[in-house]
Structures are given as C-alpha cells and as structure tokens.
Amino acid sequence: DAIMYGGLVGSRKHNESLDTLMARENRIQRLHPMYPNVPIYAFGTIMRTPYASNSGVEPYYYAKYGHDLYVLSGLQDKMDLGTLTKDEAAEMLSLKLSIPSEYLQDWFKRRTKNHAINRLLLKDTKSGIFAYFCEGHDDNSTNSQSAMEARYLGKESAKLSPKVYGSFPGADQLALLLIARYHNDVNHLTPSFTSIYPLGRAEDTVPSYESQPIGKTIAEHVEAVGGIMDPKGRPDIVLAVNTPLSSTGESGQFSNYGMMKPSTTEFMNQVKAVIDKGIPVSMVDVYFANGSDNTLMSLMKQHDLLYKVAAYNGWNTASNTIGYAIAQAILAPDMSETDHRDMLTEQYIDNWAYQANVRKNINRLTELERTNYI
C-alpha cells in the first residue's frame, strides 16, 4: 500500500490512474530479478467497506453517504451469492437512486483499480517474486464489497501454498507480522503455539469488524509467521485469548468499568499456571474492540503479571491484536530486558490507559464543549 498508494489511507482516497498504479506495480516485479538473493516479504490490503459515515480517512462524500454505500455493497454481495431477496433487491435499487451517481462511480472505480492491483500482486506471488505475500482484509464484514473481492481473490489463490501466501482479516498488524516471519525464516525457527480461553464462545467468537471466528484468524496468523498450532508436546508460546461470554463490544462502553467476573478470574488463574511452568504467555485481549478489558488488566496487576508476560495487546480490531501478540511474542526472546519492559509499558499506556479509559473521557468533554458552544 505504501508503494502503490502512499499508505493505507491513501489506498482509499487516491485519484491515481490505473496506468500509474500498474507502472508502480511493475517496479516491484523487477526487484526480484535485480536482487535474486534478497527475499521479498510484502503485504497488500483489500480496501475496506466501513459502516460508519466518516470522511476523515475516506473520500469526502463518505460523511453523508458512507453508511448507504456500506449497505449497498452488502446487498450487491448477496446478489453475487444468489441470496438476495425481493425486498433487498428493491432496497438496493432505492439506494442506487439515492446516492449521487458521481459518488457511486468514484467509489467503485477506485475499488476496481485496487482490486486489479491485488490481482497483479497475486500473479507476482505465483511467479515467485515474493518469499511471502500477505493479503489483509481491512475492516471486513460478512456481506460487503470487501468480502466479495476477497472471495474472488480466494478462488485465484486456491492452489498457492500457505507457506508463500496468506489472506486473512486485518491491515495494521501486517508489517510487524512479516518482520516476525523473516526472523523465523533466517533463524530456521518453527515456533509452536497453543491457545487458552475463558468460559464462553472461545475460539468460535466472531469479533466486531470481522467476518470469521477468532480461532481461524489465530491459526492463519500463526501459519503466516511460519509457526504451527497445537503441538503434541510443550508449546513454545501460549496465546491467552481473552474473549467475552457472548459478543464483543467497544472498550469505551459503560460495561467496561472493571467489575470482577468469575470467568475472567478463572482465566487469570490459567494464565498464572502457565507462566509458573516457565512457558511464555502472550495476552490476546479481544474482549472489547479498540482497547483493553479493565477487568483483565486489574487482575493482571493484582497478580503481578503485567511484566511477566511475553507480550500484551488489546487494541483496535481483533486481528490487529492477534498479529501483534504473535509477532511480539516471537521477537521478545531477542529483546533486552529494558526493551521488553518498554514494549509492554507502551502497550499498557496506549491500549489500557488511553484507548480503554482516557479517550472516552476526552470524547465526552469534547462533545460537552461543542454542545455548550452551540
């Protein structure tokens, strides 16, 4: 995305011609023949289909028509699958008539260009240009334009080995994930992982902003770094995945006020038992999206585990958290004690202090000031 569009946000808002994008992609093709002994690890993303009407990181018209575009793309995906009902067909026609045609054309034209580039990068993967290529699904949901594009790319990539190609939810975690993959490759490592969960839906939990169970996403990320899941013997790393009893919510919700929950208490006992055995534990806190679970963090502090884990993550989407949790746990043994402690401290300040607590208070104060000003 950085080479093709100038970055992830740029991939959503650019006005580049397809010829310009293809010329940039051609430069990537030429890298491998020029430097055949240098492995290339790369990632791209399937453009997201957000349901929120926010123009800050989307084209300007998303402020008014963003949600309508989201609903429309979901209906078009259903039509492609052959599951569209008569009522939904009528709704789809109504949306097409209500959204200005120039906005519809702009949005789908940009998506078409991005999809064409993704197909070219997939072709490069088949040609051996990349040591490993990862296709991230940015904020994907079950029915959307993103899901439809992923489905078609999935058909084209069906015969590719998972050792050279991966396609799964997420975007922000991909660069660090590839660093961990390179680390494993050059050191001839095949780390093994096992996951533990609290009571509830566990690996069958489908988190917010994503379209598949979290257990599948974890397995795909482990495969992406060259690891294996559920070894017969002692694992190299245990992923302690903090999932809710039912569905995931937002960390800024009132329900995230830190009330003690029996399931979380028992889960923390599991974590402590694994650490006492000397097995590295990486905390995958996906109870809420966009921030830490205050109950979990209070128990980690109470049990003096904040700096005894290999890694902690609880930020943004579940796949972002999973990718960082796996990658940081792989890289942690090669960090100095100071660097490792600093890494954890940064996560606690960002994920726990800011995202789960400070941010919601800032938002409330900002809204209060705006209301008073009006």
Model feature map: region roles:
Residues 1-374:
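An N-terminal assembly and electron-transfer interface module characteristic of large anaerobic redox
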